[in-house]
Amino acid sequence: MKMKAMKTIQIWMLAAILVCGISFTSCDRADNPTGESTVTEFQHELDQALSWAQVYGPPTQTLAEEVAARHKGKTTPLNYKTRESTERKCITDNSRPFELKDLARTTVLCEYDSIRKVIDDVTATATERGIFGRYRHQTSDRGYWGDLFNLKFQYLYTEIQVKSYRNYYAANPEDICRPVLGDSLYNVIHTESGVEPGLSHFYYEIIRADTTSEATREYYKKLCIEYHSHFDPDYVD
């Protein structure tokens, strides 16, 4: 309890320092500067955004764990986007650090039949706490589907995904998904699906990286669709 209290104090001390010592922008970005900025200004804003992610990550994880517990589910460890990944994303999307919504992120995992209940619970809990930002059901022509929430804190959004156990297995290699799922559940999914974990993301990365060969993209797209057929179908008709 003492360690938990100390961690909470440290988080809010960081928040106080940021509020007092740094000039930052709102989550809505209405007051953000537009146009060109210097590298120094961008790096300063990047520092701020990454620091706020450290503040808002723990309450995001707490909400996810509370919801998971109510539905006999699990959560992944809280994950923070790295500085390098954040900078690359800003360049690729022509965006600013505070516009990114996944600098702190986690995932609620549950049985396929519980997904709708978990989604309703995350929505209700986040709304009750005044931090509901948005919800999206995501699909793709590669067979992938999933559900994503963004929690809206004062200065930054964070992310909670909702996945079935089997679709989490499909998206992550063994060294990531086995510790989260546990040996027993991992082995059940491995036996029932008859395929190795993590190929969904593996195929996606190949498709995304190859921008020249339509034939290559189509080949891996078909592999991805076939791979997803071994797991839970999209619950949205």
Question: Model-predicted segments: where are they?
Answer:
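Long beta-strand-rich cores associated with HINT superfamily self-processing modules
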Residues: C90-D237
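Bacterial N-terminal signal peptides that target proteins for export
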Residues: M3-M13
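C-terminal motif of bacterial Sec signal peptides marking the signal peptidase cleavage site
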Residues: S23-S26
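Bacterial signal peptide processing site
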Residues: D28-A30
